[in-house]
Amino acid sequence: EYLGDRYQSEFMRLAVSLLSLVLFFYLAGQLVSGVVMFEIMLGLNAEWALGITTLVLLFYVVLGGAHADILTDGFQGALMLVLAVLVIVLTLMGYGIDGGLFALVDNLEAQDPNLATALNPSTPLYHSWWSIFVIAFAHMPLGLLPHLGNKLWALDSTQDRFQFVKLAALFGLMLGMLGLGGLLARAYFGDALYAEGANPNQALPLLFIEIFPTWLAALIGIGVLSAVMSTADGLVVS
């Protein structure tokens, strides 16, 4: 509706509506992440985990609409930032590994030399600088993140929108560094996450369970779940 009114074009309105159907795949990915969190942290089976994730999401989105989405995303986003800072610090400290960060790098190199280099030819995600650029571009705020658009368009002034873009870029960079937690998880668990029946998506929750008391791991897990829910509700509203 915003783009159609902005450019006074029914074609633009219709085209964006049709393209928005692709968001169902993005939403499905977020729900799967929620399933993983509930499976690991609460021991639920996949069906119950998916049902709970979906019901909680729909409950506050249906009752509150875009307003509920914006308010809850503000709270969830704060939790995500705290979690991101925690993961970055833990990784840079090489937490729980004798020798700290340098021992962490040595550990990864001993498992596979490609894990300690900028490029990893054995994976399609990081086999070239071009693939890394594409991944970075896909995560640029307001580039390919439609769930942020409704927050931007809810602002009245151009100044507020510009401020939003700056903050989104900064926070987006910090949240992207959550991937550093994968390095620490690989040092702890090795190839176990790639064994038959295992799921690499469980890396962060398993890492928290390994290095923290149960109550603290559960609390941190809420931060991970916040990332899932804040993205999913934004996609539903979009």
Predicted regions and their residues:
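Re-entrant/interfacial helical elements at transmembrane boundaries that shape
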Residues: 236-238
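Loop-to-helix junctions at membrane interfaces in multi-pass transport proteins
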Residues: 1-4, 78-218
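Hydrophobic residues within alpha-helical transmembrane segments
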Residues: 18, 52-55, 74-78, 166-170
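Membrane-interface helix-boundary signature
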Residues: 9-12, 46, 50, 72, ...
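Transmembrane alpha-helix boundary and packing residues in multipass membrane permease domains
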Residues: 29-32, 36, 89, 147, ...
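Helix-loop-helix module between adjacent transmembrane segments
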Residues: 1-64, 134-139, 225-234
